[in-house]
């Protein structure tokens, strides 16, 4: 049985909505607008075992080692067979997130591949969902 979790900030909220419109068995969502890595670290850890997880975080955090350390703690506290990180539009934040993903051998999807109006959110989350569900 397929089980997935989407965790993170507003890009996670939008991505989850688009993915769950397409799946019969919906992904669980732990995402809120403007969430930072520090806030996500304080959330209760999921007790369910998920096969896949999409991490959508970093857009609301400054780039750099302190943010990377928080994201590494979040990632270390959870075990999944497959993890995909959404890389934020901001290149500094994207580098920070991608460095964490690389340390764990996780996959990434660069949001910069998708049109945006505000430089933070994709214009069409349906395009992001299509790329993730391939």
Question: What are the residue ranges of the model-derived segments?
Answer:
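Catalytic nucleophile-elbow at a beta strand-turn-alpha helix junction centered on a G-D-S/GDSL motif
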Residues: 2-17
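Alpha-helical cap/lid subdomain in secreted, periplasmic
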Residues: 22, 26-27, 35-134
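Active-site bordering "gate/hinge" segments
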Residues: 32
């Amino acid at each position: 049985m397929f089980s997935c979790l989407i965790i993170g900030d507003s890009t996670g909220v939008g991505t989850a909505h688009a993915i769950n419109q397409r799946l019969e068995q919906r992904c669980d969502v732990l995402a809120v607008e403007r969430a930072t890595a520090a806030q996500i670290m304080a959330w209760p850890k999921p007790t369910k075992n998920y096969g896949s997880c999409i991490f959508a975080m970093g857009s609301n955090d400054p780039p750099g080692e302190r943010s990377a350390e928080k994201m590494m703690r979040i990632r270390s506290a959870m075990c999944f067979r497959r993890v995909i990180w959404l890389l934020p539009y901001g290149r500094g934040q994207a580098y920070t997130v991608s460095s964490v993903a690389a340390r764990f051998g996780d996959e990434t999807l660069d949001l910069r591949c998708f049109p945006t109006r505000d430089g933070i959110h994709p214009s069409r989350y349906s395009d992001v969902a299509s790329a993730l569900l391939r």
